[in-house]
Amino acid sequence: MLHKILFLICLASFIPTIGSISGTKDVKSKNCDGSAGLTCTFPGDCRIGDTVKVNCTSRKGCPNPVSRNNVEAVCRFCWQLLPGDYDCEPATNCSTSSTKLLVTKCSAHSSVICMGQRNFYKRIPCNWSSGYSWTKTMILSVVLGGFGADRFYLGLWKSAIGKLFSFGGLGVWTLVDVVLIAVGYIKPYDGSMYI
């Protein structure tokens, strides 16, 4: 019985320590600049797209408490913001030929007031490019394909050396490469899209 009581006392003294440690991490990771450091109360009859007056107070854990009343804001969730009102992490794992949508993490600008979480996921078009031109690759493949110039240009140096020493597979490898580049199968070494 005594060991159960001691266990509960130890557990009770340990739990606030865990909470204070995780609370400290949250405060350091929170952005307290501008509207990002505010918690705003939108009216209950708020209709999406309407301009409303909101009352805002500083978030818990942000230094320098601030209270702003009757601030004009558009009634919308953060994920409904216009593209200029948020930033997203760049998409770097796209395929070369498709323009599919990719899920990425976005966050609202600190000057924007919106409902819900300021960090959200959004589907954006996948169009990451590192500057390789499809036209230049096609020209290199047709004109100097037998020497592997197209593959050297794309950063595929291992297969380019093989193509160089076999004279483009005596022309066969060159013809196949022209078709593969035309349909977008051969892509730059980093997986980016052509410009």
From Swiss-Prot:
Q: Which residues cross the membrane?
A: 137-157, 164-184
One GO term describing the cellular component: membrane
**Which parts form a coiled-coil structure per UniProt?**
none
As given in the record, the signal peptide range reads 1-20
| Predominant subcellular localization, coarse grouping | membrane
Q: Which parts of the sequence belong to the TM2 domain?
A: 131-179
Keywords of this protein's UniProt record, alphabetized? Glycoprotein, Membrane, Signal, Transmembrane, Transmembrane helix
According to the UniProt topology, which residue ranges lie Extracellular? 21-136, 185-195
- The reply on keyword Glycoprotein is yes
Compartments (UniProt record): Membrane
Q: Which residues lie on this side of the membrane: Cytoplasmic?
A: 158-163
Sites carrying a glycan are N55, N93, N127
Whether Protein biosynthesis counts among this entry's keywords is: no
Membrane topology, as annotated, equals: Multi-pass membrane protein
Sequence similarity:
Belongs to the TM2 family.
Name assigned to this protein: TM2 domain-containing protein C41D11.9
Source taxonomy: Eukaryota, Metazoa, Ecdysozoa, Nematoda, Chromadorea
